[in-house]
Amino acid sequence: MQPSELIPERFRDGAQRMAAALRGVDRVVVAAHVNPDGDAVGAMAAAGHILRALDREFFLYVTPRVPQDLSFLPLPGTAHTTLERLPFTPRWALLLDCGEPRRLGQELADRLPELESLNIDHHLGGDGMGSAGNWVEPQAAATAQLMAYVALAAGLPLEGGLATAVTLGLVTDTGGFRHGNTSADVLRLAAHLVEKGSDLAGVREKLDSNWSQARMHLWGELMRRAELRRGGTVAFCPVRLDDLRATGALKEDLEGFVEQLRQLRGVRAAALLREDAPGCCKFSLRSCGTVDVRAAAAALDGGGHRNAAGGTLRMGMPEAEETLLNALARELDSEGL
C-alpha cells in the first residue's frame, strides 16, 4: 500500500484542501483547546512538524501549559504559554481539536479576529471557526489522525517526531485502542506508524507509568467517594477544590478518572464534576453503547462526542450536581434505561 492510500476516500478532499492551505500560510500560531489532552498536544506537535517541513514560521501556543504526563513528547519548537514576548507577530492561526473559540482561552480568543485562521477538528460543531478554511470530521477518532492525513496529502512521510505525535493522539483518544472509535482506518494508520518506527509501546508505557504520589492519593480518595445512581447504571463523583489542595494534586491528575468510573459493572454512563473555582464547575461524561452523553452535555452548553463529552456549569457544587445528573437522567430516560 502506498502511504497516500492510507487516507480514506471520505477524508481525501479535506486532507488535500488543508495540505494546500498550509502551503499558503506563514507566521502561524498553532493552538488547541485549553488544558490540552493527548490528542490536542499530539495534533499541535504534528502540525508543527508539517509546518517545519514546509519551511513555514510557527510557534505552538499551549495554555496553561503542557500537562506533566504529556511532557515526554518532543515538541517541534518552543511551546509558548502566553502571547506576549513572541518570536514574531503571527498572521495566521491553525486551530486544532477545539470546537469553539472560547475553548482556546481568553487571550487567543480575543486575538482571533485579527488573524486569518484554519480549523481542523473531529468534534461536532465549529465548522465556521476558521476564517480561511475548516475541516471538521466527527467520524475521525482523533484530530491527530486528521493531521496524519494532511501530512500524507502534502507528500510528507509519517516518521520521526511526526509519527510519535500522531501515535500519542491516537492512543489517548481511542483509550489505548479500546473505544468504539477504534476503526479499521485507525488500526491501518497505527500499523503504518509502527512500521515507520513509531514506538507505540513506548508511548503507552510513558502514559501509563507517569503517576505522581499526589495523583495516587487523589484517586484513592475519589474512589472511596464515588457513588452509583439509578440502580447502578450511573457512576458519579464530585471533586472539590479542597481535594486537590489536600493531596497536592493538579487538575490534570484527574485525566482518565471518569473512564475508570465507566468501567464499573453495570454502569452505562459516568460523570465527574470538578469544582474549578467558587461558582464554577467543570464536568466530564463518559458512556458506552448508544448512550449519547454529547446530547446531555449539549443541553448544558457543553459538547464532545457520543461517548465522551464535557462542559462548564457556572454555579456552585450542589446546584451543579443536581443540574448535571438531571440532564444525564433525561438522556438515559430517552434510551429507556
What kind of feature is each model-predicted range?
Residues 74-131:
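Active-site cofactor/cluster-binding pocket
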